[in-house]
């Protein structure tokens, strides 16, 4: 994916500050021929997947041809994965870097509601998974057909905005339409493949990406069907770091704890519950065992603010993800040893659910990363302690009323000593990271299209090349991008080895 210097120079010269004038519009999509791909699954790597797709497009990342890329965002963000909503779409004409897709107009629908397991869930429903615990939603939404979004009153009826997206160190303008809240719901059963047409990429997802491999989710959710019934999965050999994010009042309290223990300077707790000292030198630490105490179903009942140094009887909010979330799977493994310690020796703990809430320990279950961040901000506004797990691709941009949360050290190791929020994970000092898995639907029931399979393969191969926050290649990937010293070798339950 790396561009030669001559290509970089040419790209910069051609770009200037002009907008993306050749954006692939809804009318051009409707005119066809158009290839459709639908990805679902993890919310954490949304931006990484988007940028990997963009790196395969004409006119981007040093590729030849005209830049006609554009994106449709459900919300008001700047690009997928950045306050964009749980459903987005993006499109472009593929370059020779995309192999068999070269020259094709491709629309990618990307849905991240519900988290990682929704890469597999539609296919489980279509394959007749019994679903005794109700974890399979049975339906999924995506942005409505892009070809329709240029009509009157639709989000792409007017002129597109633009976002400058950096690919391989060069900034490229990509056309953007916001507030594309026109969505369509597809339903999955043993007799219905999304809709009557049953088309991969439009009626049902072709596959997607998960924070952890299928077997982890299968055990966590008591799923009966094996992966071979659905398709195939490959280890991307790309690591993704996670961190514990807390509300400002809890951040200040943890600073007070560390100041009292002589770990932080005496001035580090001079801030307030609405404006703590957020300088790196004053970042406080949270012992992992305290997170375990509130995340564990069997101990959450005795938790209140005093666990973290606050007043007895005060409220603590555990802002966790829904069971199908890969981030929740990562949290379960790191703090509860579930499902990794479910063998004969036992030791795994059950995660606390919303139904386990008490008057002083309130557990909520969020369907996306954005929900966690919003709940942490709400807790700050209510002067309450709150904590949850968020992937390290996220960075708060606080205002007086929004995004008021921050990452803390875990067992005195910071997850974000560097701007890219991954240095300690890559070095091996910070071990809260796991490797992404790529799933492609197969078999005779709900297979991906050949074009989608090719795209998923291409994206999986380039994820490690992107210089993105919280994301890094492992040595097994053989990537030219930022690379860690250790690897889990595609097994989340295996300790990283160097």
Language model region names:
Residues 12-16:
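Classical Sec-dependent N-terminal signal peptides that target proteins to the secretory pathway
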Residues 24-498:
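Flexible loop/hinge segments at secondary-structure junctions
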Residues 8-11, 203:
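General helical structural elements
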Residues 1-9:
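Bacterial N-terminal signal peptides that target proteins for export
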Residues 18-21:
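N-terminal signal peptide c-region/cleavage motif recognized by signal peptidases
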